[in-house]
Amino acid sequence: MKALKTMKLKELSEIKIGLPLERKKAKLISSDKVVYKSLTLKSFAAIDDSTNIHYEMFVADSSINSQYLTKENDVIVRLRAPTTAIYVSSKNTDLVVSSLMAIITNISPNILNSKYLTHYLNSQYIQNQLIKNTQGTSIQMIKVADLLELEINLPPLEKQQQIVNYIYTANQEIDLLHKLIDEKNKLKTEIFETLIK
């Protein structure tokens, strides 16, 4: 079997930390206010590309530099444990990214699919590596330097897309099975309630 090509994440992308929100938060008495949608740690709940990412409203004292706003095909990584990555689709652009997150911009789309990178970063293989590098006792966080040094396995783009498609389909099937379980539990309860009356 042919060995997969690997490259460090720093060779494939640009990574920057989000904005420290307290610096831009509007004061109550401030007359200049700009309202944004902002990512929160809740934004990293299990989602797929077809859903909107959870956000909260953020009132800034002035406009925020576009480098701190999500762009299509960005991958956002939660730096506080549990470390999770989310893909930014066209539905989720222009959200403010806080300093608890890193923005990964793919600069090598000819060899790296951003959705594949998201799944790769969320894999148990990478999660185990990141756990070794977490710092802190009460609030564990990873460093951007650790992200930059991650080795990324790079199958051909076509294979990356096949992996993305498989995971998308598997997630849809899992969601459907969860819905069927919920419906079966409701039906079971209703039948039981009817029978004991």
Task: Label each region the model flagged.
Residues 10-26, 42-72:
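Sequence-specific dsDNA recognition surfaces
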Residues 64-65, 91, 137:
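A structural connector/turn signal
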